[in-house]
């Protein structure tokens, strides 16, 4: 084949093949080139004192505005208040909340067990000290002003304890021994007898005995009377003290006063009193207790609070709680109840809470700051990675479109040449 004809064929082949090949290459690499043109150069370039146009790249030059637009788009379309409420409800499902609360309670109990400095005991001691020294006295003072304060409690104690109270046999014997040994010993009875047998009382007894007797007793009363006998008894008690005490003691033994007194004390009960008397006693007991609490309740509690070693009490309580199976066994129930309370609260106020949280979290400002703080090179790398991993079909489509456009140009060329 002659050389000129061969050169014409090569030239024609190149003219036909070059447009599709060039179009495919340009279409394939246009995305990378466009992305690079958006970010490059990262910093402004200067020619002498003049800044070159289109430097820095479009995105670095408008990064703050881009950050604001991205933030507005996300907050306006993606993270709307309704979407945040939906996410909050999903996050705060009862099972998750219950599990989180249970974990927190377990963690708190573990922290208490590992507390070497007894911080928990110190806090509890301060609470107990304030409760019994300040808070309860003030509360008691305020409540004691009510007329029905502790009315039900006092009546219940009176009916269940005081009304049914009886001395046991041992208590009755000890009480009788105390009465006859301390309150009414023979010497005390002798002195009481001497005081009773005064001249006037003896005269009254003698006259009454004379006037109110009849028959044989009248004869004895008017012939002999009782004046001389009572006078001699008084003189005997005054002059023969030890002998009189001994005779009185023998008389008490012979009359079995101790046993009689013990039996009487053992049978003594408020239930044997009339109903009206019991009601009055109940009313009087309540008034006495309330009056005492009004007048002495506050200082009594303060004295009690200041006299107790609350530090030691708090340590004992904390140590007991650490080893208590009731505490560890009730953590699940406590977390369940707390989750139920939180669920009821969130049903009514979740929308209000989300509206209050959004300004506090300032998500839009976080997005703006994060974009502004990210270097342009990192943004470019991230965009390139997304394009290569998720948008590779667009890159391939660019190459195919370039190839098709190049083929169309070749077709127009052939048509224009008359092939």
Curated annotation (Swiss-Prot):
Its main location: membrane. Pfam families: DUF445. Keywords: Membrane, Signal, Thylakoid, Transmembrane, Transmembrane helix. The chain crosses the membrane at residues 394-414. Residues 1-22 form the signal peptide. GO terms for cellular component: plasma membrane-derived thylakoid membrane. It comes from the Bacteria. The keyword Membrane applies. It is a single-pass membrane protein. The keyword Transmembrane helix applies. Coiled coil: none annotated. It is found in: Cellular thylakoid membrane. InterPro entries: DUF445, UCP032178. Belongs to the UPF0754 family. PANTHER family: UPF0754 MEMBRANE PROTEIN YHEB. This is UPF0754 thylakoid membrane protein sll0412.
